[in-house]
């Protein structure tokens, strides 16, 4: 279907440019029966495995190989000392690119994550990347390494710094190859929203085969933010492939939308969800046509809608992209790379996953604040992928002043600067 509702053929070939398409399409939806007992036994086994790996991750420093750290508070700090004990830092300090530890001292395993703020608690959902990293034969041409699917994890925190592991809330299925959550498949970029009408927590997740030819959007729901989530089914929204995704709930209307990388990643689709957030109304639109983007995130600031995403280069980082609009449906005005300074052309060696509103206050004069969350992928050892969290600032740039298109001219653009460490309670300084 086109944005006007008229059927159209997929303009992208099934076998497109491999570098631009880290994901591919497979047609069979499969039997979505859920084997609870065996899946949860598998989850417990994996949790025990995390404990055995803790010492290795806690003491080994790897982040200095991908970024030259610049200290903002101690000029003589060793560049290689990236595993500084938490008691040496302020309780509200975030160190991008370091190993984030949970309250038990274990490395946090929640990649490609999404966040939910509910009843004064933050919840972090993400992909568990553990075990051997390997490249299936079908993925060798574009470097599509992977680990077997374990499930979706959940952590909770009162302050964005101290995270408690709450379990594997959507585990993989080990004994049914036709299931969407089969452990040899893919479940990526989980995003969870709360539906006040149904009092349910709804998770959307990119479902795929290991060669990324399936390209579907899966949905699950729970009565609790810490699960367990019951898997419902997967879709091909608008009868098109759907890869990287995000879910956005409009603050003004509480209408929810699924935003997906579609048509072999050449176009983003915005699809309106039903009132229970688990299906589609049939209203949708194509945006960013021909721009080949993935890792989308959408957020509101005032009366404007902002988009941040990435280009398509597999696990390798590239320059982030941003855009602004007065409507979720567009038109969208691109604002360029929000990252500034050294390593901006690689998004500080990372890829966007979420923008989280974190309330008002701090040194920015009480305005609403936003956290840019990204993943620093390690394609040779995905379990050692790191997290890059940085504050977003807003400023009118020269490009904004020159922009004539609706939705862009004169509006403030999101700006992200690298900081080795920052205080989540009071981090916003002048650009």
Give residue spans per PLM region.
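N-terminal targeting leaders characterized by basic, low-complexity, disordered sequences
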Residues: 1-14
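Carbohydrate-active catalytic/glycan-binding domains of CAZyme proteins
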Residues: 11, 16, 20-27, 36-43, ...
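Core hydrophobic alpha-helical transmembrane segments of single-pass membrane proteins
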Residues: 45-51
């Amino acid at each position: 279907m086109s944005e006007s509702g008229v059927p159209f053929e997929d303009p992208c070939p099934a076998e497109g440019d491999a570098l631009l398409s880290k994901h591919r399409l497979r047609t069979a939806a499969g039997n979505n029966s859920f084997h609870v007992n065996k899946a949860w036994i598998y989850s417990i086994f994996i949790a025990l495995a995390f404990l055995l790996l803790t010492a290795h991750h806690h003491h080994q420093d790897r982040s200095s190989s991908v970024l030259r750290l610049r200290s903002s508070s101690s000029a003589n700090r060793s560049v290689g000392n990236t595993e500084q004990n938490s008691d040496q830092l302020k309780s509200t300090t975030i160190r991008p690119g370091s190993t984030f530890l949970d309250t038990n001292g274990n490395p946090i395993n929640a990649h490609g994550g999404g966040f939910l703020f509910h009843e004064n608690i933050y919840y972090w959902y993400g992909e568990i990347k553990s075990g051997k990293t390997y490249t299936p034969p079908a993925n060798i041409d574009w470097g599509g390494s992977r680990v077997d699917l374990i499930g979706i994890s959940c952590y909770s925190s009162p302050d964005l710094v101290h995270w408690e592991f709450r379990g594997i809330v959507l585990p993989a299925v080990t004994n049914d190859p036709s299931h969407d959550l089969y452990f040899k498949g893919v479940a990526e970029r989980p995003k969870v929203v709360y539906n006040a009408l149904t009092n349910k927590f709804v998770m959307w997740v990119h479902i795929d085969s290991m060669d990324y030819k399936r390209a579907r959007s899966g949905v699950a729901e729970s009565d609790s933010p810490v699960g367990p989530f019951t898997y419902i089914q997967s879709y091909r929204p608008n009868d098109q492939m759907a890869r990287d995704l995000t879910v956005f709930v409009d603050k003004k209307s509480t209408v929810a939308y699924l935003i997906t990388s579609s048509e072999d990643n050449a176009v983003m689709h915005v699809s309106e969800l039903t009132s229970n957030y688990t299906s589609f109304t049939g209203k949708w639109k194509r945006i960013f046509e021909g721009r080949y983007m993935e890792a989308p995130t959408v957020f509101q600031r005032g009366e404007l809608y902002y988009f941040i995403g990435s280009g398509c280069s597999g696990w390798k980082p590239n320059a982030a992209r941003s855009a602004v609009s007065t409507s979720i449906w567009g038109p969208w005005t691109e604002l360029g790379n929000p990252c500034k300074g050294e390593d901006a052309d690689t998004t500080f060696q990372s890829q966007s996953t979420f923008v989280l509103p974190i309330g008002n206050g701090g040194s920015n004069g009480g305005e609403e604040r936003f956290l840019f969350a990204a993943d620093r992928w390690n394609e040779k050892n995905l379990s050692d992928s790191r997290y890059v969290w940085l504050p977003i600032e807003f400023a009118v740039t020269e490009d904004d002043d020159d922009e004539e298109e609706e939705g862009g001219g004169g509006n403030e653009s999101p700006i992200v600067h690298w900081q080795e460490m920052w205080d989540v309670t009071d981090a916003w300084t002048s650009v």
